[in-house]
Amino acid sequence: MHIRLRAILICALVTLPLAAQAQTFPGADWQRKTPAEAGINPQLLKDAIDFAIASEIKNPRDLKLNHYRTFGREPFGDAIGPIKDRGDLTGVIIHKGVLVAEWGEPQRVDMTHSVTKSLLSSVVGLAYDGGMIRSVDDIARDYMAPIQLYNPLPMSNRADRLGAPDLIDLFGTPHNRTITWNHLLRQTSDWEGALWGKPDWADRPTNKPDEWLTRPRDKAGTVYKYNDTRVNVLALAALNVWRRPLPQVLKEKIMEPIGASNTWRWFGYDNAWVVIDGQPVQSVTGGGHWGGGMFISAYDMARFGYLTLRRGKWGDRQVLSEKWVNMALTPTGLQSPYGFINYFLNTDRKQWPSAPSTAFMHNGNGLNMVYVDPENDLVAVVRWIDNNAVDGFLKRLIAAVAEKS
């Protein structure tokens, strides 16, 4: 009996360091190892990095110019938030919680575009974890207080505005009253209207202009459509629930606990100001479609990716509930490679055939990618890579990890 108990204790002591090693977390800086020290084939990893560098996007680094060549050509496409020129193609590779490779300008703060959406959904997740949102299947309208647009000039009662609403009603139409938090999080709401001067139909409009204003609405939850106006609706709805600026919530409850730097900023639009409890507050955006969104370094992006790799846990603290992260990773029935914004899934290995089906990615225009691979214990941040080269890069990266040095 004593021998058996002793054997059990010895096994426990042996496995404890292994468990701790499997759950390594960075302090103020990432622990660093060479690829060889981390058990990664150095030459194959170099091949992957060289492939990424050779696959830099051809778009101009002047992102304001790039905007007016792309999204800026849409109806009402003017940029109304800040835009910043981008840097070099940059990457950071984290394996088993240790930084094994970096290149480019990983400290540089750049626009991360729609990776912002993953941070936005996380702030909604914090509201869910805290009981402020009881269920994602609840009707969003039931959580809304009146929203006053901030205007420093007293114009709301002028005669030329007689009959115009003084308040923003996000969910006032019969269709919008049926929208749940889940619909907004999965981009299946078909929300109708305009917010911050951007009509829902003006984002990636169809080639049928006659239908832009007249098409019948799809029942909420029945059609998936990627749409930044509707994501910005979610951001304003979340602000209305939190009653405080979302960047403050993110900083206090996620970025500080995971040790992010103080260099990131989350911007909204010039006109996206409302009054919350007597104070003007900017409602942030879910991306850089019309400017704004999250401006952040690759190092800090890697920390967020690592948080989601560990299912919301950081050290001994559960920053985001595991339940929330698992919900975010649940495929949207209408769009199986998509979970909550902006979790792109590898369901049936359709998105990236070279990666495991359990891998997922936080994606943004550019391409900004935060690749998360639980099977290989990997996080890879790559910025400004051609989207068509992503699977080729992942194929080479995974080969480097799989084939020991």
Residue ranges and their predicted role:
Residues 7-17:
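Bacterial N-terminal signal peptides
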Residues 19-106, 130-133, 244, 400-405:
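N-terminal leader/targeting segments and the immediately adjacent pre-domain N-terminus
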Residues 41, 97, 111-136, 184, ...:
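Active-site SXXK
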Residues 55-58, 139-263, 299-302, 307:
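Active-site-adjacent helix/loop patches that line small-molecule binding or acyl-intermediate pockets
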Residues 81-94, 102-144, 218-223, 292, ...:
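Short active-site loop at a secondary-structure junction
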Residues 118, 122, 187, 230-237, ...:
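Active-site-proximal alpha-helical segments within enzyme catalytic domains
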Residues 262, 272-288, 326-379:
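Active-site Gly/Thr loop motif
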Residues 361-405:
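Structured C-terminal helix/loop/strand segments within mature extracytoplasmic catalytic/sensor domains
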